[in-house]
Design a protein with these regions (language model features):
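Conserved SAM-binding loop
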Residues: 5-6
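Conserved SAM-binding strand-loop segment of SAM-dependent methyltransferases
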Residues: 10-26
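A short acidic, Gly/Pro-enriched loop at the edge of an enzyme's catalytic core
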Residues: 25-35
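A short SAM/SAH-binding and catalytic strip from SAM-dependent methyltransferases
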Residues: 33-47
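A short glycine-rich, Lys/Arg-flanked "PGG" loop and its adjoining helix->strand segment in the class I
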Residues: 48-63
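Conserved class I S-adenosyl-L-methionine
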Residues: 65-95
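Short alpha-helix
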Residues: 93-115
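Core SAM-dependent methyltransferase catalytic element
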Residues: 122-138
Length: 138
């Protein structure tokens, strides 16, 4: 996914890093001005360390964007999966409620700027597929 992102974004002021998010991030305090986590936090049991590191590596007013499988889909049994050699592989996932994101963000020094829910066009009357949060470091 990092390689695909690098293909799409050529700006010199954008840096893509790949690391184990559950460990201390290999960067200085205030090193970033915008952090994106896309469909990754459902695979991490405890959100606090992630938010804590995001707070450490952002400056006041900087943003933290999260996009995840909506917990409503998880309540229905939907899991992350991918295809490999014609086999479907299900990936371990943890259900994080909306309040888990907002409360952990608040405890880590973030304020919620925006929350959005997303559906496929044909699923407008069903639970949302994705949820995104935009937080700002207070």
């Amino acid at each position: 996914m990092v390689a695909k992102a690098k293909e799409k974004v050529k700006a010199e002021n954008v840096r893509f890093d790949m690391a184990d998010l559950t460990k201390r991030w290999n960067c200085e305090d205030g090193a970033y001005d915008f952090i994106i986590c896309n469909l990754v936090l459902e695979h991490i049991k405890d959100l606090y360390d992630i938010f804590s590191e995001a707070a450490r590596t952002l400056r006041q007013g900087d943003k933290f964007f999260i996009n995840e499988l909506h917990p409503f889909k998880q309540y229905q049994g939907t899991k992350a999966r991918f295809e490999r050699n014609s086999a479907t592989i299900e990936v371990d996932a943890f259900t994080h409620h909306i309040s888990d994101f907002t409360n952990t963000a608040s405890a880590s020094g973030f304020k919620l700027i925006k929350i959005n829910e997303y559906w496929h066009a044909e699923d407008q009357n069903k639970p949302p597929r994705l949820v995104s949060f935009l937080f700002e470091k207070a």
